[in-house]
Amino acid sequence: MLKKLKIKLQYLLPQHALTRLAGWAANKKAGWLTQQVIKIFASYYRVNIKEAQYTEFSAYSSFNEFFIRSLRSDVRPIAAGDNILVQPADGTISESGRIDKDKILQAKGHDYSLEALLAGQSLLAKEFENGQFVTTYLAPGDYHRVHMPCDGVLREMIYVPGSLFSVNAFFAENVPYLFARNERVICIFNTAFGTMAQILVGAMIVGSIETLWSGPVDSQRKGIIQRWVYPDEGSEAPIILKKGEEMGLFKLGSTVINLFVSNKIKLASHLQNGSITRLGEILGEAPH
């Protein structure tokens, strides 16, 4: 009964209005009250503030400043090697493995199609058929900046409006086509491992999704799909990002999905469902 009620509430709640309210509140600078909220949040979610660039709670004047805190440069070493890809974020592996032609596993008993995830871009979807995928869930207490698994040249970015269902394990197991329904920002890169997609999926009370090159992508939330195409390497002003470099962030949590083309990489064996991962750890490698 409680399970059904939790699911029903997700459909009934005014998702976008609640998200706007949460974003507004998280940006407020309320002095002592803000400090108390940050301390309670950090204690409840066991945030290791000693890893942050600024280790005093008083350094953060709003909740969002704390939530998108930067880490010290020495706490997340980036695995070396030209053939090595690294985990793009702190989080928990929700699912990973082979894409079954065009189907991606969401949770036991649930899958969704590449074309649905990629906003109907059928030619783009075909590039990833029978490839590999990794879905990483960022819990509220995790570090919420997202980095590059490998060197890449940005090819295009697509903003897809959508629902804002919660994306934790419970809802992944109970809301069909969750990641293909939720608001998301799709970033496509050309890499030494072929085309790579890094998709930042929104959720309930995710105030904003931002990228390094564009700032808040979803700030206007016009309700239409928007697409941007970027210069190739060798052209004027390409956007080139290095392995381990920051590429985006979430203001209040969510999920990162990585897609890789077929026969280019082998995912690391430790990527088991429910396993805790850290930015910079080995995600996979190119077979020799």
Curated annotation (Swiss-Prot):
The yes or no answer to whether the keyword Lyase is present is: yes
UniProt subcellular location:
Cell membrane
List the Pfam families hit by this protein, alphabetically.
PS_Dcarbxylase (PF02666)
- Record note on modification: Is synthesized initially as an inactive proenzyme. Formation of the active enzyme involves a self-maturation process in which the active site pyruvoyl group is generated from an internal serine residue via an autocatalytic post-translational modification. Two non-identical subunits are generated from the proenzyme in this reaction, and the pyruvate is formed at the N-terminus of the alpha chain, which is derived from the carboxyl end of the proenzyme.
Predominant location category: membrane
InterPro entries assigned to the protein according to its UniProt record, in alphabetical order: PS_Dcarbxylase, PSD-B, PSD_type1_pro
Q: Which BP terms in the Gene Ontology apply to this protein?
A: phosphatidylethanolamine biosynthetic process
Q: Which GO terms describe its molecular function?
A: phosphatidylserine decarboxylase activity
- Annotated catalysed reactions: a 1,2-diacyl-sn-glycero-3-phospho-L-serine + H(+) = a 1,2-diacyl-sn-glycero-3-phosphoethanolamine + CO2
Q: Would you say which domain of life the source belongs to?
A: Bacteria
Q: Where does the record place the site Cleavage (non-hydrolytic)?
A: G253, S254
Keywords from the named record:
Cell membrane, Decarboxylase, Lipid biosynthesis, Lipid metabolism, Lyase, Membrane, Phospholipid biosynthesis, Phospholipid metabolism, Pyruvate, Zymogen
Q: What is the membrane topology here?
A: Peripheral membrane protein
Q: What is its EC number?
A: 4.1.1.65
Active-site residues, record numbering mapped to chain: D90, H147, S254
Please share the entry's free-text remark on the cofactor.
Binds 1 pyruvoyl group covalently per subunit.
Query: Any keyword Heme?
Result: no
Entry-annotated residues carrying Pyruvic acid (Ser): S254
Describe its function: Catalyzes the formation of phosphatidylethanolamine (PtdEtn) from phosphatidylserine (PtdSer).
Q: Which PANTHER family match?
A: PHOSPHATIDYLSERINE DECARBOXYLASE, PHOSPHATIDYLSERINE DECARBOXYLASE PROENZYME, MITOCHONDRIAL
Relate the assembly described in the record: Heterodimer of a large membrane-associated beta subunit and a small pyruvoyl-containing alpha subunit.
Q: What is this protein called?
A: Phosphatidylserine decarboxylase proenzyme
Per the UniProt entry, what species is this protein from, by scientific name?
A: Hamiltonella defensa subsp. Acyrthosiphon pisum (strain 5AT)
